[in-house]
């Protein structure tokens, strides 16, 4: 694997949600061989993160197609972060996938992106599309995080603030520690997309990478997800000393190996 990244091109923009809250979504797409790589980022992250860039560089080196984008309210896309919901970001994920992907795709989702990847798989199964799933690579996946990892863990005081004011500013250990909004809409709308209460059919191989020292998504959450997936061709790798980001060189190497194993 080379350490040199391809030259970063300017993003193209597509409009999503024309009939309801239209927003312009920033996308970087490179044509190439299949299976292509489709990146789904995490909550309050963007497509210029370490893992996204490393996968894009690997795709460029191997002549593979690569697509990444920013959800509304993230990175270079339009919109306010506080307006975001799981359904809104899923709509954008499906729109980008449909417009820029063709043939089999290895969908890689980090944290919230893991939830998005599972929801995307469900949407793909509903009707024929130009692109299909070669497999999923889920990095510290956080399905149902708005309910299981946020709401259920919030104190009564925080819950009350969200319910009465509609928002709570959560302190962050990332991005310089700037607090970010957790809205009532995010929590309530997220309940429309919960997955962990039943089996999850994705119709493709799944590779899960989870850090044992992850303070944001406990390793038990990844095990719970694995138990909901079909038993065949699902591999969970526990990186005992890994944190939530899994962005160290050795972590990146494992992620790329998982992508390459699928195809």
PLM region spans:
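Short beta-strand element of the alpha/beta-hydrolase
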Residues: 34-42
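The serine-hydrolase catalytic nucleophile loop
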Residues: 43-56, 220
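Gly/Ala-rich beta-loop-alpha elbow adjacent to hydrolase catalytic centers
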Residues: 109-117
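The alpha/beta-hydrolase serine catalytic core
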Residues: 8-13, 129-239, 243-263
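Catalytic nucleophile-loop/oxyanion-hole region of alpha/beta-hydrolase
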Residues: 74-100
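Conserved alpha/beta-hydrolase
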Residues: 54-78
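Short beta-strand immediately N-terminal to the catalytic nucleophile in serine-hydrolase-like folds
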Residues: 107-109, 139
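N-terminal cap/lid segment of alpha/beta-hydrolase-fold proteins
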Residues: 1-32, 248
């Amino acid at each position: 694997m080379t350490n040199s990244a391809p030259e970063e091109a300017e993003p193209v923009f597509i409009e999503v949600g024309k009939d309801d809250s239209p927003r312009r979504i920033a996308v970087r797409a490179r044509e190439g061989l299949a299976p292509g790589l489709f990146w789904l980022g995490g909550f309050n992250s963007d497509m210029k993160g370490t893992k996204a860039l490393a996968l894009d560089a690997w795709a460029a080196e191997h002549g593979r197609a690569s697509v990444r984008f920013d959800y509304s309210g993230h990175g270079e896309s339009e919109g306010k972060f506080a307006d975001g919901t799981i359904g809104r970001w899923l709509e954008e994920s499906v729109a980008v996938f449909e417009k820029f992907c063709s043939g089999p795709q290895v969908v890689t989702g980090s944290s919230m992106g893991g939830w998005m990847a599972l929801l995307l798989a469900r949407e793909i199964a509903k009707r024929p599309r130009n692109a299909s799933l070669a497999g999923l690579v889920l990095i510290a996946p956080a399905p149902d995080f708005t309910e299981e990892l946020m709401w259920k863990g919030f104190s009564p005081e925080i819950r009350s603030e969200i319910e009465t004011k509609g928002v709570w500013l959560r302190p962050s250990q990332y991005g310089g520690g700037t607090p970010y909004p957790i809205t009532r809409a995010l929590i309530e709308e997220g309940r429309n997309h919960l997955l962990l209460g039943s089996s999850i059919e994705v119709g493709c191989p799944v590779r899960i990478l989870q850090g044992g020292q992850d303070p944001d998504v406990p390793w038990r959450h990844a095990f719970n997800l694995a138990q909901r997936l079909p038993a065949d061709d699902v591999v969970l790798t526990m990186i005992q000393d890994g944190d939530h980001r899994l962005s160290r060189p050795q972590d990146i190497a494992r992620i790329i190996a998982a992508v390459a194993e699928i195809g």
